[in-house]
């Protein structure tokens, strides 16, 4: 996820393959929501997002990996139950949310089967998976479907989206827990390059860069070692300073 506020741009980089998958799914669900807003003007982004999310869920064993991660989160939170200063109600709500998500993840094959058995989606999916633009002359069944009223189309899109809503909920919860347990620390670099090793296993890096700096991070690494190099936007002036760079870094552990 890359987001902005008034002063900073937030970049995130996964250091584990399953975190990469989680972030891709989060992005796919965000695209699915955004495309529904302008569905009447352009339907292609919605179907592209729906098929991309579906394909990712079919290729990756999300059920096993995400269940395992949420179980670990649950165990970690349960250790706080006897702490005198903890908000027990809030803690129990979060634990209950985790348990609910773990239970619903077991039904992922059923959700995917529902989409795979949808006659319209099955008839157009292969065309959407091919490179290049598709014209409605190649998809007359979609052309007919698009001629329905806006209300009918929105209702159908809602049903398709709701099929995967519980998966989205679990992904959102996992990434929220991961992000909230990390703390940003200020860092200043003299040469625009950071290399760091960690005894603790890391899952993701989060980097806040001032908008005014007009630079972006190029990140590489794995769970115990990573590098960050800052670069100006391609095509921008080479005079962009890469010295005395100030940013904030959060190291997220699984």
UniProtKB/Swiss-Prot annotation:
It is found in: Cytoplasm. InterPro entries: ZapD, ZapD_C, ZapD_sf. Disulfide bonds: none annotated. GO terms for cellular component: cell division site; cytoplasm. One of its GO terms (biological process) is division septum assembly. Transmembrane segments: none annotated. Interacts with FtsZ. PANTHER family: CELL DIVISION PROTEIN ZAPD. Cell division factor that enhances FtsZ-ring assembly. Directly interacts with FtsZ and promotes bundling of FtsZ protofilaments, with a reduction in FtsZ GTPase activity. Belongs to the ZapD family. This is Cell division protein ZapD. It comes from Idiomarina loihiensis (strain ATCC BAA-735 / DSM 15497 / L2-TR).
């Amino acid at each position: 996820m890359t987001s902005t506020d008034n002063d900073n741009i937030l970049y995130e980089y996964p250091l584990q393959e399953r975190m990469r998958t989680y972030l891709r799914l989060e992005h796919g669900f965000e695209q699915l929501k955004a495309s529904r807003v302008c569905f009447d003007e352009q339907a292609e982004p919605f179907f592209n997002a729906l098929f991309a999310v579906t394909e990712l869920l079919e290729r990756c064993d999300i059920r096993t990996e995400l269940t395992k991660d949420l179980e670990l989160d649950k165990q970690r939170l349960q250790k706080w139950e006897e702490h005198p200063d903890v908000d027990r109600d809030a803690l129990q709500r979060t634990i209950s949310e985790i348990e609910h998500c773990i239970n619903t993840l077991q039904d992922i094959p059923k959700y995917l089967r529902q989409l795979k058995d949808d006659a319209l989606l099955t008839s157009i999916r292969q065309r959407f998976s091919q490179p290049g633009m598709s014209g409605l002359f190649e998809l007359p069944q979609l052309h007919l479907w698009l001629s329905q009223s806006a209300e009918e189309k929105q209702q159908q899109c809602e049903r398709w989206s709701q099929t995967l809503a519980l998966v989205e909920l679990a992904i959102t919860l996992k990434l929220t827990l991961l992000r909230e347990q990390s703390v940003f620390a200020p860092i200043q670099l003299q040469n625009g390059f950071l290399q760091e090793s960690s005894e603790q296993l890391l899952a993701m890096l989060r980097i806040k860069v001032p908008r005014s700096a007009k630079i972006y991070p190029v990140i590489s690494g794995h769970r115990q070692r990573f590098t960050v190099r800052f670069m100006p936007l391609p095509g921008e002036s080479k005079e962009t300073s890469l010295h005395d760079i100030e940013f904030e870094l959060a190291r997220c552990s699984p």
